Amino acid sequence: MPESSFDVVSKADRQEVDNALNQTAKKIAQRFDFKDTGAQIRWSGDLGVEIRANSADRTLAVLDVFKEMLIKRGVSLKFLDVGEPKPSGKEFRLAVTIKQGIPTETARRLITLIKDEGPRGVHAQIQGDQLRVSSKKKDDLQAVIALLKAKDLDIALQFTNYR
């Protein structure tokens, strides 16, 4: 009997994040409490978001609006790595990084979790920034998916390539 497998990945949907960013920019342009604060949000590189405003609490308020839009778009907040508001001239900047991939240390913890608490005969291996889980029984793979969904991890997981 051939082995079945699936991949465990941690990738934010870039298009949904972009939509949330555009909605946030539109909302802060319309809201009265952001008037004359110089508040703006934009992409900074491929996976970075930069928030600017004339005070630290206005940058955090824009961040709250951005988080609200991400939740509405179905993107987990576990993808965000938020820095501290830093003064830069007459304004404050806040750097937000979108985390992609499963770090090696977290992947090792997931493997030990699967070996300790998962069904017997399930094998997990690290492949770059993702995890491949394989077994001869599809029911065991579904049990592993349920196990990983039940655990409160510090990263958001998706299950892809189910064969």
Curated annotation (Swiss-Prot):
Molecular function per GO: nucleotide binding
Coiled-coil features, chain-numbered ranges: none
Entries under InterPro entries matching the protein: DUF520 (IPR007551), UPF0234-like_C (IPR035571), UPF0234_N (IPR035570), YajQ-like_sf (IPR036183)
GO terms for cellular component: cytosol
Keyword field: Nucleotide-binding
NCBIfam families according to UniProt: PRK05412.1
Function per UniProt: Nucleotide-binding protein.
Family: Belongs to the YajQ family.
Identification of the protein by name: Nucleotide-binding protein Acel_0286
Originating species: Acidothermus cellulolyticus (strain ATCC 43068 / DSM 8971 / 11B)
